[in-house]
Amino acid sequence: MSKNYLFTSESVSEGHPDKLADQISDAILDEILKQDKNARVACETLVKTGMALVAGEITTSAWVDIEELVRNVITETGYDNASKGIDGRTCSVINAIGKQSRDIAQGVDRGSLEDLGAGDQGLMFGFATNETPTLMPSAIYYSHLLMRKQAELRKSGKLAWLRPDAKAQVTLAYENDKPKFIDTIVLSTQHNESISQKELHDAVIEEIVKKVIPNELITKDTKYHINPTGVFLIGGPQGDCGLTGRKIIVDTYGGAAHHGGGAFSGKDPSKVDRSGAYMGRYIAKNIVAAGLADKCEVQVAYAIGVAKPVSLMVNTFGTGKITDNQIEKLVAEVFDLRVGKIIENLDLLRPIYRKTSNYGHFGRELPEFTWEKIDKADILKSAARI
């Protein structure tokens, strides 16, 4: 890739139909983990006009009122009137949940957490870069900020005409591999009938864009596409069917890193799609925080029923202060990559997952997000002797 280029990432709001589905799946997971930390959960959700379907495989001693939980998530997200695409109080809720296959369970459940086997085969990636304060790529970082601001203004009532469904997209111009300015901002937001397109355009620029995007990244040539198709009244599940796991690039690094293909929401941490990806982020972030590299991608891969990974790879894209092979050896020494130890060390059996389902699983330094800690940075730096 040339050192001068444009790079784009997107984010979506919590009212986007796919994110509504993610929230429902993770809310169910959380409620189960509150009662049963040993539960096996793989929960998928589909939302469409007037209905929500929950399906999957769950083995647990917990009892959860699935229907009530689904309704609460939908209304809390802002869908409390049929005119918005779905009303959580009156929509149909269909439950098609079964139990985890015995064939899978026999390979995963080994008694002690230390011996826990991976819930499936798969490959996962973690990534970090020193472009932003949270060590996330710039385009996804600013896209998430735009969507969080949209939600804040909607919930506070400051822009009362906003509705839950929205998307943002940011294009960064890079020079010598460093982000220099924003070339294009795209933001589409659902709204009610009371607002004109000019009023909406001006309010989005003044109250959303200018409040979260640093002035130094905006130039006279920065292009804005605000609700570029015009009216956006029909949104949410009425506009598009929503499914769990369809926003995996929004959930991770906005396309700036590889993705193993596995979604996160609705899965307990024995599923390495989730826990392995969280560990990958933890490793990559600590490597960059330690100053071992400006940019780092980590790949891990697992076999179903096997505790240890089958492979580990580190790529610093030529920015490493020591070789990638040397960093790999340090990672193997400092981090325990057995599935059970990942769960234990990152404390992943807590009911924290609904918080992850919006605005990215990475880059928000919340107390619950243990994979965002940089507590191994000093250890890595000392071991690398840099």
Curated annotation (Swiss-Prot):
Compartment(s) of residence: Cytoplasm
A single GO molecular function term of this UniProt record: methionine adenosyltransferase activity
Residues the record lists as binding K(+): 44
Catalytic activity: L-methionine + ATP + H2O = S-adenosyl-L-methionine + phosphate + diphosphate
Domain of life: Bacteria
Binding residues for ATP: 16, 165-167, 240, 246-247, 263, 267
Pathway this chain belongs to: Amino-acid biosynthesis; S-adenosyl-L-methionine biosynthesis; S-adenosyl-L-methionine from L-methionine: step 1/1
GO CC annotation, single: cytoplasm
Keyword GTP-binding included in the entry's annotation: no
PROSITE patterns in the record: ADOMET_SYNTHASE_1, ADOMET_SYNTHASE_2
InterPro entries: ADOMET_SYNTHASE_CS, S-AdoMet_synt_C, S-AdoMet_synt_central, S-AdoMet_synt_N, S-AdoMet_synthetase, S-AdoMet_synthetase_sfam
Cofactor binding note of this UniProt entry: Binds 2 divalent ions per subunit. Binds 1 potassium ion per subunit.
E.C. code: 2.5.1.6
Keywords of this entry: ATP-binding, Cytoplasm, Magnesium, Metal-binding, Nucleotide-binding, One-carbon metabolism, Potassium, Transferase
Cofactors required: Mg(2+); K(+)
Record: residues binding L-methionine: 57, 100, 240, 271
Region Flexible loop, annotated ranges: 100-110
Gene Ontology process terms (BP): one-carbon metabolic process; S-adenosylmethionine biosynthetic process
Residue positions binding Mg(2+): 18
Family note: Belongs to the AdoMet synthase family.
Subunit text: Homotetramer; dimer of dimers.
Function as written in the Swiss-Prot or TrEMBL entry: Catalyzes the formation of S-adenosylmethionine (AdoMet) from methionine and ATP. The overall synthetic reaction is composed of two sequential steps, AdoMet formation and the subsequent tripolyphosphate hydrolysis which occurs prior to release of AdoMet from the enzyme.
Protein name: S-adenosylmethionine synthase
